[in-house]
Design a protein with these regions (language model features):
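Phosphate-coordination loops involved in phosphoryl transfer and adenosine-cofactor binding
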Residues: 54, 198-200
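Short, conserved, surface-exposed binding loops centered on an aromatic residue
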Residues: 160, 193-196
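Short hydrophobic beta-strand segments
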Residues: 34-37, 200-206
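Thiamine diphosphate
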Residues: 1-170, 175-176, 184-186
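Short, flexible coil/linker segments at domain boundaries that flank nucleotide/cofactor-interacting
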Residues: 28, 196-198
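A general structural motif
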Residues: 64, 178-194, 202-208
Length: 208
């Protein structure tokens, strides 16, 4: 029998909760950070952001193509725009805008897909985003980041703020086990980490 490893911090949060809290703290110190949402303040955990920094959030409504277009326009003027929307809709409805207005234009929009994968559960297949990796990996000039835990999420958001390139961040809804016990390991795009060493089998995974 294999050994069951319990590695869940009692204070573990959903990665998208950590994303929103980190973005709020960074935005307090940087007025160029702007959150753009598609009627997703609640699901994107941006209610506190809107209440605290009402001049740094733009509500588009349920219009994902317009969401990305507005974020692209803001980014082109020097704003650090985070376009926040459920991953299932952001990466399907707004694909043309992501491709042309963001990636191919080398426009540093921070695309944020929330409730990714099957996070929406009972809402059904219309709300599941099993396609976003495949779709976005086919687009040149777009970095894709799916943090594994709260530590990586916080570091990824800080990196995204300071990266002047198009980027896609992918977050789920469930509290995540803490896989990073030593913050000194740092965070780097494209660099994997060994969680546990063994000799019987190799398991390679990403994200949540």
């Amino acid at each position: 029998m294999g050994e069951v490893i319990q590695n869940i911090n009692e204070n573990a949060k959903a990665n998208q909760d950590v994303f929103a809290a980190t973005l709020l703290e960074l935005a307090k110190a940087d007025k160029n950070i702007v959150a753009v949402t598609s009627d997703s303040r609640g699901s994107g955990k941006l209610v506190a952001f809107g209440q605290t920094l009402p001049k740094q959030i733009v509500e588009i409504g349920i219009a994902e193509q317009n969401l990305v277009g507005v974020a692209a326009g803001l980014a082109s003027t020097g704003k650090k725009a985070f376009a926040v929307s459920p991953a299932c809709f952001l990466t399907a409805r707004a694909l043309e805008q992501i491709k042309n207005d963001v990636a191919y234009s080398d426009n540093p929009v921070r695309l944020v897909g929330i409730s990714a994968g099957v996070s929406y559960g009972a809402l059904g297949t219309t709300h599941h985003s099993l396609h976003d990796y495949a779709v976005l990996r086919a687009i040149n000039n777009l970095s894709i980041i799916a943090p594994a835990d709260n530590f990586e999420t916080k570091e990824a958001v800080k990196l995204a703020v300071n990266q002047d390139k198009p980027i896609y961040l992918r977050f789920g809804k469930k509290p995540m086990p803490l896989l990073t016990e030593d913050p000194q390991v740092g965070f780097e795009i494209g660099k994997g980490r060994v969680i546990r060493k063994g000799a019987d089998v190799a398991i390679i995974a990403n994200g949540e």
